[in-house]
């Protein structure tokens, strides 16, 4: 059976539980000077059976899923850039950790779930940005795209204009 065949009976959905609101530009030269996005984006993964729409928890193993963050302006995303252009934008705008592995945690209702936390993600330029979070399933040596979600736009300020952490 091909690696992708097992996923044809599943629905993958990412939801953003904590949207980024603002950030201070990052010089990306000193650890203390990183303008971390605030609040840290937190995502939750839901996997359901295609037939029954029931949650599938055995698939929520930490070593199976990864989410990659792509930072760009809303205008950049509307243009549907090629992967090469997106990579160039990452070098221009992003710093910090761009990927997050799945963490099995409990939500605010004490229910176990699959979460991705971006506690060290920063932006190097001022302006309005969005983050595209892309979910991949690791199947052997392959990364299989499963879902994606976009953050709300957020503003990145210069250090002088930054209103502070929320």
Explain the meaning of each model-derived region.
Residues 1-130, 136-166:
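Structured recognition/catalytic domains enriched at protein termini
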């Amino acid at each position: 059976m091909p690696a992708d065949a097992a996923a044809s009976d599943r629905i993958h959905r990412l939801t953003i539980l904590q949207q980024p609101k603002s950030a201070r530009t990052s010089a990306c030269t000193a650890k203390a000077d990183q303008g971390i996005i605030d609040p840290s984006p937190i995502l939750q993964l839901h996997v359901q059976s295609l037939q029954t729409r029931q949650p599938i928890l055995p698939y929520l193993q930490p070593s199976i899923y990864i989410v990659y963050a792509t930072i760009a302006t809303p205008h950049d995303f509307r243009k549907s850039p090629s992967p090469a252009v997106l990579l160039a934008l990452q070098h221009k705008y992003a710093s910090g950790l761009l990927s997050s592995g799945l963490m099995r945690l409990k939500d605010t209702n004490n229910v176990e779930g699959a979460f991705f936390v971006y506690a060290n993600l920063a932006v190097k330029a001022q302006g309005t940005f969005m983050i595209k979070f892309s979910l991949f399933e690791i199947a052997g040596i392959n990364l299989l795209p499963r879902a994606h979600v976009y953050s709300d736009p957020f503003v990145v300020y210069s250090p002088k204009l930054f209103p502070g952490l929320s």
